[in-house]
A protein has these predicted regions:
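NTP-handling and nucleic-acid-processing catalytic cores
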Residues: 2-192
Length: 192
């Protein structure tokens, strides 16, 4: 029982043709400015904890933020902070509904007269909500059995759903982050 087979995400150096340890990555680390993007993900199924028929009408979106936009084609999930306060708002101009962290609302909607708050919930209430994939590459992962078969991980509810993780904050972005398990150690752990 001391040895098991599993998968682990490691950085790879194309120059050296080998994987790198976290220690090697930390050497010579420099802060730098990376591009960040906010993407809207169309909600297709409301979570069990929230009674919201409008959520499935095609005009409700999660606003997710990422500093790794090149990983968006591999998106398989979204993540909220379990104890963070989130709001569903109605954009008065477009009529669309958006879900994001309450603490980040003023960063995205500067004028309070441009929106109306529909309700406020904790991140843990959104677990299990489903959304439409950005790209068709991994649509098979919607199905739980296919997701488990392809990823080699236990996917009880399939991909393209809401998860919770304590590392999600409201310091930047929308309070919702995108998950690409193939590209990040934290993302991979959340998806397991």
């Amino acid at each position: 029982g001391l040895i098991y087979e599993g998968k682990y995400i490691l950085p790879y150096c194309p120059r050296c043709s080998t994987v790198l340890s976290n220690h090697e990555l930390a050497q010579g680390y420099k802060d730098r400015n990376d591009p960040a993007v906010t993407v809207r993900f169309k909600v297709t199924k409301a979570p069990a904890a929230i009674s919201d028929a409008d959520m499935e009408n095609g005009n409700t979106y999660f606003l997710a933020w990422t500093t790794t936009p090149w990983t968006l084609p591999s998106n398989e999930g979204l993540c909220m902070g379990p104890d963070v306060d989130y709001v569903k708002i109605k954009d008065k101009e477009s009529g669309d509904f958006y879900i994001l962290a309450k603490a980040r609302l003023a960063s995205y909607f500067k004028n309070e007269t441009d929106y109306e708050i529909v309700y406020e919930k904790k991140g843990k209430d959104f677990i299990g909500a489903k959304y439409e994939p950005l790209f068709p590459y991994f649509e098979d992962l919607k199905d739980a059995a296919k997701c488990s078969e392809i990823s080699g991980q236990k996917c009880e509810d399939g991909a393209f759903r809401m998860f919770n993780a304590d590392y999600v904050t409201t310091d930047d972005g929308t309070g919702i982050v995108h998950i690409a398990p193939s590209f990040g150690e934290e993302d991979s752990k959340v998806f397991k």
